Amino acid sequence: MRALPLDIGPLHFVGIGGIGMSGIAEVLHNLGYRVQGSDLSDNANVKRLRDLGIPIAIGHKAANLGDAQVVVISSAVKASNPEVMDARARFLPVVRRAEMLGELMRLKWSIAVAGTHGKTTTTSLVAQLLDAAGLDPTVINGGILNARGTNAYLGTGEWMVVEADESDGTFTKLPATISLVTNIDPEHLDFYGTFDKVREAFRAFIHNLPFYGFACMCIDHPEVQAMIPQLQDRKIITYGLSPQADIRGANVTLGPRGARFDVILTDRAGGGSRTIEGIRLPMYGRHNVLNALGAIGIAAEMGIDDAVIRDGLYHFEGVKRRFTRTGDAGGVTVIDDYGHHPVEIAAVLKAARDATEREVIAVVQPHRYSRLNSLFEDFCTCFNDADQVVVADVYAAGEQPIPGASKEALAEGLKVHGHKSVHVLTNEQALPELIARIAKPGDLVVCLGAGSISTWANALPKQLEAVQGRRRQTTLAGGAP
């Protein structure tokens, strides 16, 4: 891999424990650059980077910079941060995360995966197919790849696969050779202001492509389909389950072992087509079939053999916090999932419905008061595939409460919209007892959210087992369970 042309000295990452920042830091470290950082939380990403030999301070103060010559920040870091203030007082370059990612992308041919939902899984699937083809890509992802135990790794090949985060608009600056768009929904309106601005950003993302590149776009999503006619003078490949898709999924079957489907690949210019039959994907849900079709579209256009595509998908090991099984207790299976937008929640619960013949119990920790408030009606209707819903306190993520955006309001909204079984969770400690009371063997408990609920999901199987054990002892002693 080519290096940056000048000696840039030590790089200091403010908020290095974030999923996007940690990936960039890891790749730069593996390239031989001196990397250091700070974070408010001593989280799993911080521990992983420390194990690589990267020094990280907990807390933010000017002294953390040391002899740093460049400071890298995410959009979440404020100008009032003492490390940022000290960097600017010392006339050091202060670089946004996306700008640093863009500089890394210039060192290779790059594939950037964007979209409101599904981009982490799709990025992982693209990387998997390039790996299967022996292309050994560099990868910077927004989630931990189960096969690697990290969200980023440095490959020896000429390609880089990155997740393009649209949350602050900076993804429009990424110099991709190939772009993929999964879907476009109203999200991050606190930054964009209007949905039209979101649409404009995605158009700019595609228009940045060079003439020799191409975009792979999900035609099943109405917003993406509506954008295609506006993207003149760019090569576009579409994918989806629609008969209009260039990369079309057919004969889809979904079950407890994942998905099985065929893919019909059509060349619009030449008029020919071929079929890859019997693809098996060890993931649940129609939405993951779509994610796989996007990855297939890129792999096929890059000339990767059909047999390699089939084998690569079959051996895909998934991404942490994407329908991740954390354990079982008394026949009850606990699932951890990052889904926190109504579209994501609905897709995950539909996948859960396909994965079990028994009940699906959703435990949701709404993420941000602003999101719950602006999408309240959507939240009230996205749990239809859950037999029971448990609503926890809103994870504030630094926000102040908004009247009408609370767990009580959401629970009442679900009931008003026709949901038959809704529970308000008193606190985290009450979850094991509640689940023990309402769950039966064979049920799936799906924990949903982008906040601290992942910790709950990982602890729940053992906690549930303990509650079940106490209940059995009480029953044997002749008391009420």
UniProtKB/Swiss-Prot annotation:
Its main location: cytoplasm. Its EC number is 6.3.2.8. It catalyses: UDP-N-acetyl-alpha-D-muramate + L-alanine + ATP = UDP-N-acetyl-alpha-D-muramoyl-L-alanine + ADP + phosphate + H(+). One of its GO terms (molecular function) is ATP binding. Belongs to the MurCDEF family. The keyword Cell division applies. This is UDP-N-acetylmuramate--L-alanine ligase. HAMAP family: MurC. Cell wall formation. One of its GO terms (cellular component) is cytoplasm. GO terms for biological process: cell division; cell wall organization; peptidoglycan biosynthetic process; regulation of cell shape. It comes from Rhodospirillum rubrum (strain ATCC 11170 / ATH 1.1.1 / DSM 467 / LMG 4362 / NCIMB 8255 / S1). It comes from the Bacteria. ATP binds at residues 115-121. It is found in: Cytoplasm. The lineage of its organism: Bacteria, Pseudomonadati, Pseudomonadota, Alphaproteobacteria, Rhodospirillales. PANTHER family: UDP-N-ACETYLMURAMATE--L-ALANINE LIGASE, UDP-N-ACETYLMURAMATE--L-ALANINE LIGASE-RELATED. Pathway: Cell wall biogenesis; peptidoglycan biosynthesis. Keywords: ATP-binding, Cell cycle, Cell division, Cell shape, Cell wall biogenesis/degradation, Cytoplasm, Ligase, Nucleotide-binding, Peptidoglycan synthesis.
